[in-house]
């Protein structure tokens, strides 16, 4: 018999992406991108099903988030976030 898996452990939700973005800002990120889209402090991250909508473009997983800033502080902010 297999174990019962929670589907939410395998799906990236809008709040998951928002939590990563917020933690990176809190950690001092100076610049950030999700996929090939620049993220600003007021950028909207919207998920419809498993598709991420950013600035009118649709992206499917896996999602890539990159940031420029103080590496140690950003890692610490990600580690300290209860939402990530």
Regions found by a protein language model. Name each.
Residues 1-84:
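Core subunits and conserved enzymes of cellular information-processing
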